[in-house]
């Protein structure tokens, strides 16, 4: 067939920024003849793959979308009344279109640079305010990964805050079953004993208690006396709860809970076969400095204006490392933003109306089922009824299946039904008809109004919420869609995301999130599948998971993989648990030491600690590589206690260490396993396969290498891939009842069987669109772009580390430490000045304090690279002006950066440089200028005066 008739597949050059001509120019500039020659210089021969990946060729966008549509069509959308922590919801269309589908929101990074993140920080502050208000507690964080992991985090927070010497954590049998299993997994690694029981029978001696309010199967209990009893023995009370129910029920903070956790999924976020959804945690003020996850706080900027920032960061894993009590890094920012905006959209009256409608429909259903002769076990309820259906259970289930209805199958003689905001009167009638058919009775025609008038409510008077909800004006100020649209635009305009400019963050891989990859995630066939629906309804998801798993195993060289971990840190944790389980199965439980290089990501030592391992740090040599002499000494020192070496490759210093295979051999000879952190996999896809050059296990960051967007701090997916001997110890997969089915090595690490399955189509689409050749080319160009930036900037800023032939991998570290002595200018000053040039800063002070790490990714074209390079060169000249004494050391464009419009329009200008230099340091900014909404934020003030809820409107006057 003529090539003119070949399908048009142009995705690869759309994803890869530099054109072929640009690549030639760049190669010439760095003194290299070809991309292949560059790889020969950069990648050690011992690890280089000898052949292409066994993956299909690149396909067109239309072909891949048609393929995914066919896969999605194999899922079967049923009416879901399963509940169990996952509920039907209506995503407001204005939020769907302008947030979830808007790259201004989904391509942003975690808001470490607050001056260019004020929009999403405000949206997250709304979320925190909403959660704290509804739970009746003092402070909320900005999201956790899901309800199950939030419960596990509550357990560790309780242990830190408890006055009890006990190692027992009591978990109510009324909790969601998947929550119980995730808590058990976490407890086992930490040496905590989980006592599962009915709290009505009394509490054992324990350091903490986890309750469910309302119960998983519907009941609503008054926990006041129980909370008092727990506190009397020094225990901390944690409560898993439902935000919608709390619109009508007494908040946990009022009846004695110290911590409240749960999922905000039903606030506008679809099922997605289990995720992603934003977990939440709120707590009393006394626990705030130990609370896990990001925390948005209010501070002020250099002009005295209110400004938001991430607060209390010194408690987090990237600071505390092995002393951290949580490994949370990426959370669920995009989903938390959606949930908070759901509350803004509906307002307090709307939320109460939704909750009341759900509750009244449940009361009507209870009355109708009682009329049919079904025993409803629980007299108290919000939205869930437990039914004794006895021998009629199979017939009722069959009748439901015939009507495409899912009920919760508790056991062979009981069913449960959970209602939600999507239920209509017609749905209620269909549900009643199903039970009548299963009982072989005539249909019962519902008179909704009559039943509503007669049916008693399910919330006891003593537990009915008194007073209003969502009192802050932000939840009452939006009246029309026009108002909402403009509010969302105002927030988005405050932020700098990939839709505006390159985000050169080292070790973060801020690459293109192509529109074609994003489209399938909102299709109903993917969005509306309940994670605990019968397996025959998720055939499409299972096929997608199988295909993606095989592709990732081929890319990495491993034998098996779990897609369950819903962040990179959770992938690390799961991988270390697999190693721990493997050693224990071999009768070597004493192997509990994890060696970690000093340059490792902060999540590495934090994850090792959570997995019950002792961390021993291995030094780096002068070239930034693992110090082999120190490694040998540490191997000798720990002896048969060695569990693993956890190493990032290419290293966090941005180089391919030549000795990696030798390092793996040394660890294996000592009886340990090699954990290779896959955070930098973007430098190896199609070029090297860690499972084939000595590693035993890796996690991948699908939100880095495989194009799931960062979402401003989540969602993420962190699959853990292993060689065959570790496969039996991958995370356990829960069955339809949310329990572990059969034998398994370890328990689950996430609440849903396949974690954040709803965003897996993104990575599948990326791999299919790129094909084997495109994936390799992406790696080649990522390495080219990094080396080009390093070569162009080397005369202005020393490049701290390089591999053989003076090359870097996919990122480079610019050493700006000498400038501190010569000019008083710090890495932070350069980072803030880059905002005036329209750029997000590189990674600051990691892995080396006082430096900047740059990762351009393959998606940035030559023009954008040159714009960044020009900015960095111009900034170096601005520093030189200070060094030469032409500008004041304390009053200069860097120390005062970023410059807001308010600063530049001030009537008096008292600075030692012209306004023009502050605003337009390069001519190109006159055509497209991003204005930071706030001046430099005062971090210390924010931590000294901690406020983590919305300020009164007057504060902004």
Swiss-Prot record:
CDD domains cross-referenced by the UniProt entry: GDC-P (cd00613)
GO CC terms in record: cytosol; glycine cleavage complex
SUPFAM superfamilies assigned: PLP-dependent transferases
GO biological process, one term: glycine decarboxylation via glycine cleavage system
This protein's record includes keyword Acetylation: no
Keywords associated with the record: Oxidoreductase, Pyridoxal phosphate
Catalytic reactions of this protein: N(6)-[(R)-lipoyl]-L-lysyl-[glycine-cleavage complex H protein] + glycine + H(+) = N(6)-[(R)-S(8)-aminomethyldihydrolipoyl]-L-lysyl-[glycine-cleavage complex H protein] + CO2
Official protein name in the record: Glycine dehydrogenase (decarboxylating)
Record organism: Bordetella petrii (strain ATCC BAA-461 / DSM 12804 / CCUG 43448)
Gene name, Swiss-Prot/TrEMBL: gcvP
